[in-house]
UniProtKB/Swiss-Prot annotation:
Residue positions binding FAD: 9-14
Record-given protein name: tRNA uridine 5-carboxymethylaminomethyl modification enzyme MnmG
Family annotation (PROSITE patterns): GIDA_1, GIDA_2
Family, per entry: Belongs to the MnmG family.
Record InterPro entries: FAD/NAD-bd_sf, GIDA_C_N, MnmG, MnmG-rel, MnmG-rel_CS, MnmG_C, MnmG_C_subdom, MnmG_C_subdom_sf
Gene3D superfamilies (alphabetical): FAD/NAD(P)-binding domain (3.50.50.60), GidA associated domain, C-terminal subdomain (1.10.150.570), tRNA uridine 5-carboxymethylaminomethyl modification enzyme MnmG/GidA (1.10.10.1800)
Any one of the GO BP annotations: tRNA methylation
Binding site for NAD(+): 268-282
Cellular compartment(s): Cytoplasm
Amino acid sequence: MNYDVIVVGGGHAGIEASLAAAKMGAKTLLITILAEQIGAASCNPAIGGLAKGHLVKEIDALGGQMGLTTDACGIQFRLLNESKGPAVRGSRAQIDMDRYRVYMRNLLLNTPNLEVTQEIATEILTKDNNIIGVKTHLDNNYGTKKLIITTGTFLNGLIHVGFNKLEAGRVGELSSKSLSASLKSLNLEMGRLKTGTCPRVLAKSIDFSVLERQDGDQDPTPFSFRTKEFNKTQLPCYIAYTNEKTHEIIRSNFDRAPLFTGQIEGIGPRYCPSIEDKINRFGDRERHHLFIEPQTREATEYYINGFSTSLPYDAQVEMLRSVKGFQNAKIVRHGYAIEYDYVSPTELKHTLETKKINGLYLAGQINGTTGYEEAAAQGLMAGINAALNLKTREPLILRRDESYIGVLIDDLVTKGTKEPYRMFTSRAEYRLLLREDNANLRLSKYGYNVGLLPKEAFEEMLKLKSNLEKGMEILLTKDMSPNKENLEFLASIDEDIINEKVPLQKIAARKSFTIEKLRKLNEFFLNLDDKSLNQILTEAKYYHYIAQQQIEVEKMKGLLDIKIPKSLEFKSISGLSNEVVEKLNKFAPPTLAAASNISGITPVAIDILHIAIKYHCQKTK
């Protein structure tokens, strides 16, 4: 049984990888431990958030699936940081996690070129450092040249609840020990990480009347640029707070906390600590927020976001019932911590193919990341690049200046990680260029070129791009003089008058200027759609900042164009420290730009390396 591409793992990374490969024409097999759990939301029932929403928009622009399914299964939509600048706003949706899972599974089962089998992958088969297949627990050998591993927390997974330990990849599902051993046998550098999840509580046991209600946006915007209609009927979330009694209960159980007893060895996520870790680290806090999120549209269970814990079950019940509104709470599913193996992402090329084994790709939590969106983004890129390689086409490597996906992968590959990595807007140097609202303008060309984005979606983007270019040309080339007619116009739209001739862009850049006012500024804008007008207005308001970032990008592109010859011996370059030589050898950056992103590689070292490359190229001509 031979396939062009085999994907191991049916989580968010595996879904995007298998769909991408199959849609690009590769005969694809998805191997998953439990077919019913394809697309399961193991942790919180939500997609997106700050920076994570950017990733979902970029996945969508490339032709991926996550945004479309979120729109189909969303039960609340919110734009976070709406009062701040467009670069740091983030879309977030609560999802019906049951419907999301069924939707994704049905989609995969009905996708041409894609087969699904419920088996456990146990061994990676190689020959002369090339992938030739994968073996399963049923002694089936599946042949392939491209193998994508997207195992999430299942690699040697170990669940902790108090002193109790359970080998599992998720509660109720087996872990994958043999596959972890197989990866280690390939001499890949591996480590151990930890994450956790929160209790789920029976809705009828919660007193919602004493909780703060949090509604979605009145006029929600879908995640996908391709979604034309979606269910705007939304469910509320709620906010609760821990208190000093809660904290006392947690402190009294520190001696039973796997996190503090040494039972857990893996490093947990810095920005999503367990509740016991919060109480330990922030002992002066009087309370901590808890976000009470419905798991489905029926809202029979609620996820207690912010209450991740691995304390014993009895302690979980006691501390939860100390929270106002939860005095009679009944836990349906307890919280737990889980440790799992991961591969150091410095073992990867920017294509997400391993450097040591040709045809072996890794995506998702196996690369040290945390989050559905980070996983899906990697899965999509691994699937695309595996399929492109089969066609002997150039790989798709997104730059840091054109996508958050590019930032994510570049950070992982060039810097590595010793703790679960999550995306933040602060990780992107050019975030004004990488807004949610222009993701399709930035990336649709790639999605269309590889064959994932439909033609109509690409043409819609081209129309938006044309409107933006024409609109900005008008704003930058046409002026407004302080004559009587113009002053009366400004007064009619409640705008301050001008005392000198100014470009229309300066008028549009005012904080008070809206798309309704823009429509009246020039006849070109009169009949434009809101999406185009919003895009034009954003570009106008941040024009000078955007222009400055584009200048910085052009400087960096100069470094991108300078490739580091594989034959260049770093240790022979005078002036490079032993640390720099060691890191250059370890990471093998393909370009000067990639080298400059490696932690510890100084600007001086880049200058020395640049000179050495010039000399090397002249000598080898």
